[in-house]
Amino acid sequence: MPIVKLVILGSGGAVPKADRMLPAIYLEDWLGHRVLLDAGEGVQYRLLQIGISPSSLTLIAVTHMHEDHILGLPGLVITSKFLGGRLKVLAPKSMHGALSKLGVEVADSYEEERFKIKCVEVCHTVDACGWLIQWDVGYKLDLSKTSGLPKWALTELIKGKPVKIGDRIITPEEVADPAHKRFKYLLYTGDTAPCPEMWKKVGSVDVLIHEATFADDVSPSKAHEEGHSTVADAIEAARALNAQVLILTHVSARYPDKSRHRELASRISPPPYIYIPEDFETLLVKL
């Protein structure tokens, strides 16, 4: 079963707290990809604390130029160079010139056969990308349509490849379970106000990692003016995107803990299932 591991290395906003560092999330999938979403100050040490070398990262995806999301990047670049590696960094196009001077490989998308990640524009105060990850998890076959087929053919069909049995060519679509989705999606927003135009472009996702800078003590208009969201905004986004799982992060240092965020989230009947993790918490998400 496809499982994605998320380790929350920093769940805070612009100002760190002793138990809530600046934004950074480590993602590892069942295919072996290791992705760092944002690179807040001190993230290199946090990676080492969970046993991950910077040089082992498949790529780093930063959402925008604000310091709380990128101050950990120079250290990662330097360490990777010492270890003989060259980091791949995904970022908004407005950041490419500055990042290329660090000697990293810069782009705004990355693609392999079963894994894609691309920038989707969000609604912040500067040019900013949310990162949409797509996995090809293969087809789930309808057993009533595959009776009698050899095992090798089933394996190829699950991978999405047609097979030839005698004179007949069978495509995966012919024998697939229509209730099963071949592609699974995770969206990490970074900093954003409510962004209906982005929701329309994306369509739907399985997992949404959305900022919730504010609980309910700041007016929505004030939060949106600053390019941020409230808990209610994040829940609205999850429902607009049909997300089954919502993970709230980027919690302002104005809150001594996340109890108010959790209280607001507890009023919602799933879906989405809402998680408000602490730093160093690991989430295993089944796609």
Curated annotation (Swiss-Prot):
Homodimer. The keyword DNA repair does not apply. Its cofactor is Zn(2+). PANTHER family: ZINC PHOSPHODIESTERASE ELAC PROTEIN 1. InterPro entries: Metallo-B-lactamas, RibonucZ/Hydroxyglut_hydro, RNase_Z/BN. The keyword Methyltransferase does not apply. It is an enzyme of class 3 (hydrolase). Belongs to the RNase Z family. Zn(2+) 2 binds at residues 68-69, 191, 250. Its EC number is 3.1.26.11. It catalyses: Endonucleolytic cleavage of RNA, removing extra 3' nucleotides from tRNA precursor, generating 3' termini of tRNAs. A 3'-hydroxy group is left at the tRNA terminus and a 5'-phosphoryl group is left at the trailer molecule. Coiled coil: none annotated. This is Ribonuclease Z. Binds 2 Zn(2+) ions. Zinc phosphodiesterase, which displays some tRNA 3'-processing endonuclease activity. Probably involved in tRNA maturation, by removing a 3'-trailer from precursor tRNA. SUPFAM superfamilies: Metallo-hydrolase/oxidoreductase. The active site is at residue 68. GO terms for molecular function: 3'-tRNA processing endoribonuclease activity; zinc ion binding. It comes from the Archaea. Zn(2+) 1 binds at residues 64, 66, 124, 191. Keywords: Endonuclease, Hydrolase, Metal-binding, Nuclease, tRNA processing, Zinc. Pfam families: Lactamase_B_2.
